From Swiss-Prot:
InterPro entries: UPF0210 (IPR007841). Homodimer. Belongs to the UPF0210 family. This is UPF0210 protein Teth514_2074. It holds the Pfam family DUF711. NCBIfam families: PRK05313.1.
Length: 455
């Protein structure tokens, strides 16, 4: 295949000036064959299998980065939800051993994070599910690279409100156990509705039960590239033209991810799973979803019209990206994590963006309320109620939604917290202080919605 000089120049510019990168290469590993009635044996099997399967993951990713000149920011692992293979773990201490085995394996192979300290409880808990969930605060506070996710709702099962109520308490406790780091443990914990089993992004990645023995899933990132493309349009460009340029740019971004993913799978002697089309921002200036929305004509992200602009962006990204790969999956849309997006941070600080507006935006974008810092004294029941609202959006709209929220110990509205790295920094946001205690304490399940009458 021959390339024109301007195509080569465009690619170089995308990487060097517009911050195009492969956000993650994530290896999904099946751990069901590690099951044992002895926790020590289980932990050892988990460590051995991960270190065997992923021993060359980082090397291959680094080689591809050098060959193609496209940064590969993260190398990660996702595993079978631990609750499915750990019924033999009878105490919090047993689960901590498993979490530390995951952490040790991640360190040994050199990956940034390992996801799958997870449970699927959308219809109810097994005894093992409950033990795992109750171990999460200590597991995340005593490890560096382990990430946890709990699926509490689906469109077909409804919402497990007992799980929602419990997760508010778990999030609070996780933040409190990591208060010396501004509650960062809660940044490694996400609550899902309709969680996908092939998501390459953290903290929600796990290797789903329908997946193969070992797969490579890839997530791309390119808000800066799309922002640069939109900045070339004048104010007279209509929404059709905006959509068209986003589609074309998204195709180019996704094509790079497809190439890297397939080569990585081939060199690791495993199968290629999916390409996740999600636009994932970073804290760097110009690499922001909020700035893209503002480039469409909003004075600030959060202004009236923000949800419509985000809907256009999300749809155009999917339409362009899906043409670049035969296997699209994961979350595939636009992320709106507050602490990881310089434009979102600016909008919150300006008073333009609230949790309620973010919730509205999650109706039309990729996931949900993400990396939001709230006052440390927010009641667990209020956190649970925020989760319930977000789960309802996912359940009714047949889409993945999630909550990753950090009640920062000792901080109040208007304070600032620094998480570091890709997790960025965030202003502590205001939370509605009216109580939902009685609502949350009712328990039970919110029934699955009727799907034939769509209004």
């Amino acid at each position: 295949m021959r390339f024109a000089f301007d195509e080569i120049e465009e690619t170089i510019r995308m990487v060097q000036a517009e911050k195009l990168d492969i956000r993650t290469i994530t290896m999904g590993i099946n751990l069901r064959d590690c099951v044992s009635d002895n926790v020590e044996t289980l932990s050892n099997k988990i460590y051995d299998k991960i270190t065997k399967k992923a021993k060359n993951l980082v090397k291959v990713a680094n080689d591809l980065e050098s060959e193609f000149g496209i940064p590969i920011v993260n190398k990660r692992i996702s595993v079978t939800p631990i609750a499915l293979i750990s019924e033999s773990a009878k105490s919090t201490e047993d689960f901590i051993k498993i979490a530390k085995a995951l952490d040790a394996a991640a360190k040994e192979v050199g990956v940034n994070f390992i996801g799958g300290y997870s449970a699927l409880v959308h219809k109810g808990f097994t005894d093992g599910d409950l033990r795992l969930i109750n171990s999460i605060p200590e597991a995340l506070s005593s490890t560096e690279r382990v990430c946890s996710s709990i699926n509490v709702a689906t469109t077909k099962a409804g919402i497990n409100m007992d799980a929602v109520a419990l997760m508010g308490k778990i999030i609070k406790k996780t933040a409190e156990l990591t208060k010396d780091k501004d509650g960062i443990g809660a940044a490694k914990l996400v609550v899902f509705c309709n969680a996908p089993g092939d998501n390459p992004f953290m903290a929600g990645a796990f290797h789903g039960v329908g997946e193969g023995e070992c797969v490579i899933n890839v997530g791309v990132s390119g808000p800066g590239v799309i922002l640069a493309a939109l900045s070339k349009l004048d104010n007279k460009a209509d929404f059709g033209q905006i959509s068209e340029i986003i589609k074309k740019t998204s195709f180019k971004i996704a094509r790079a991810g497809e190439l890297i993913g397939r080569l990585a799978a081939e060199r690791l002697n495993t199968s290629f799973g999916i390409l996740d089309l999600s636009l994932a921002p970073t804290p760097e200036i110009g690499d922001s979803i909020a700035n893209i929305l503002e480039a469409m004509g909003l004075s600030k992200c959060g202004a009236p019209g923000t949800t419509a602009a985000l809907a256009l962006l999300n749809d155009a990204v999917k339409k362009g990206g899906v043409m670049a790969s035969s296997y699209v999956g994961g979350l595939s849309g636009a992320f709106i994590p507050v602490s990881e997006d310089a434009g979102m941070i600016s909008a919150v600080e300006a008073g333009a963006l609230s949790i309620e507006k973010l919730e509205a935006m999650t109706c039309v974008c990729s996931v949900g309320l993400d990396m939001i810092a709230i006052p440390g004294d927010t009641p667990a029941e209020t956190i649970s109620a925020i989760i319930a609202d977000e789960m309802a959006i996912g359940m009714i709209n047949k889409k993945t939604t999630a909550v990753r929220i950090i009640p920062v110990p000792g901080k109040k509205e208007g304070d600032h917290v620094e998480f570091g790295g890709l997790l960025g920094h965030a202003p502590v946001m205001k939370v509605n202080n009216f109580s939902a205690d009685t609502f949350i304490k009712r328990g039970g399940r919110i029934p699955a919605p009727l799907q034939s009458l769509n209004n």
